[in-house]
Amino acid sequence: MTFPVEKVRADFPILQREVNGLPLAYLDSAASAQKPNQVIDAESAFYRHGYAAVHRGIHTLSAQATESMENVRKQASRFINARSAEELIFVRGTTEGINLVANSWGAENIRAGDNIIISEMEHHANIVPWQMLCERKGAELRVIPLNPDGTLRLEVLATLFDDRTRLLAITHVSNVLGTENPLPEMIAQARQHGAKVLVDGAQAVMHHAVDVQALDCDFYVFSGHKLYGPTGIGILYVKEALLQEMPPWEGGGSMIATVSLAQGTTWAKAPWRFEAGTPNTGGIIGLGAAIDYVASLGLDKIGDYEQMLMHYALEQLAQVPDIRLYGPAQRLGVIAFNLGKHHAYDVGSFLDNYGIAVRTGHHCAMPLMAWYGVPAMCRASLAMYNTYEEVDRLVAGLTRIYRLLG
C-alpha cells in the first residue's frame, strides 16, 4: 500500500506556505517537527472549552482536565509499551528528563570513583548533565569512540565497563548521523556489570515503534515537539522499582503529600512527586493528539516510507559534486553533509533562498564535530510529510550552489 504522503501533507498547514517566493521544503524536522491540524485543534479546543488547573479541583472543568491529562499518561505508556502508566513522568522535554535522572537517581547513586559511560555521538543534553554530576561527585565520565562510518566502536565499549560502572547513557538514534545504536547488545553488556541504562529516544520514537519492556532499559526519554506535538512537553519513563526509590528533584505544589513547618514535608507517590507546579496541560493534550495521529498512520508504514525516501536521498546526494556525507549507509531521519570547503552557514543560507529549510551548525554535538574535524555541518532531516520532489529540490539547490561558489 502506498503511503498517503499528500494526504498527510494536507494535515500540516505550514507546508502550504512559501519562503522567498518558493514553496517551503521543510527539511528540519529533527530539530522540531511541524504540527498537524489534529494537534493544533486539540490544544486549541482544550484552551477554548476545557481549561482549568488540574489536581485537587472539585469543579467539573478541573476534574475533566485532570482526567484528560492522566489519560494521555496512559496513552503514552501504551505508545512505548511501559508496564504501567505510573512509570511515566511528564517533563518539559528530553533535556529536562535527563537532568531529572542526573539530579535524582544520580545524586543518590553515584559516588566518588564510580564511572558513567556515554558516547562520542551524544547530544549535549546527554553529555553536560553527566559532566556536571561527575564533577560534583568525583566520578569519571567514559566515552565510547566512533568508527569512521559513524557507528560506535563496540569493541571499545566492552573495555570501558568495570565493577564501578553505574550507568550507560546512550542515544537511541544520533541526531547528526542518524546512526541507530544496537541497544539490545549494549544493554546486555551493561547488565553483566550491574549498570543501569538511560536511553535518549528523542530521535527514535517518530520513526519506529519503541518497546521499553523489550529493551529492558531503566530510563527512556523523548520530547513531544519532535513527534509532531507541542513544545515544552516530553516523557521520562523510569522502571517502577527505581522510580519508587528516587527522591524528588524540584519542590513545590502538587508533588507533596503533607507540608508542616514543624515536621517538614512528605512527598506524593511517584510519578506525581516529580511533577512540581502547574503542568503544561495544554501541551500534554497536544502530545496525546500527536500520538493518536502517528498511530492512525501506523509507525510501521511511516518507517517504511521514510526509509525509501532516505535511500533515494542518499543516492541522489552522492551525485552532488564535492559533497561530503557523514554517517552510515543505514540510518534514520537525518543526513549530515558539507559542500566542499564552504561553511555550512553559507550553504544553508543559499538553500533558504531557494525555499529549503535545513539545520546548520554543530547540532548540539560539539564533540562529534571535533571528531570529524569540522566546525559545523548542514543537516537535512526527512519526516513522514517530506517528498521525493523536495529531495530533488535539495539536490538541485546544492548543485547550483556548487556551480556558483565552485
Swiss-Prot record:
Its EC number is 2.8.1.7, 4.4.1.16. It comes from the Bacteria. Keywords: Cytoplasm, Lyase, Pyridoxal phosphate, Transferase. One of its GO terms (molecular function) is pyridoxal phosphate binding. GO terms for cellular component: cytoplasm. Pathway: Cofactor biosynthesis; iron-sulfur cluster biosynthesis. Its cofactor is pyridoxal 5'-phosphate. It is found in: Cytoplasm. Pfam families: Aminotran_5. Belongs to the class-V pyridoxal-phosphate-dependent aminotransferase family. Csd subfamily. NCBIfam families: PRK09295.1, sufS. This is Cysteine desulfurase. The gene is sufS.
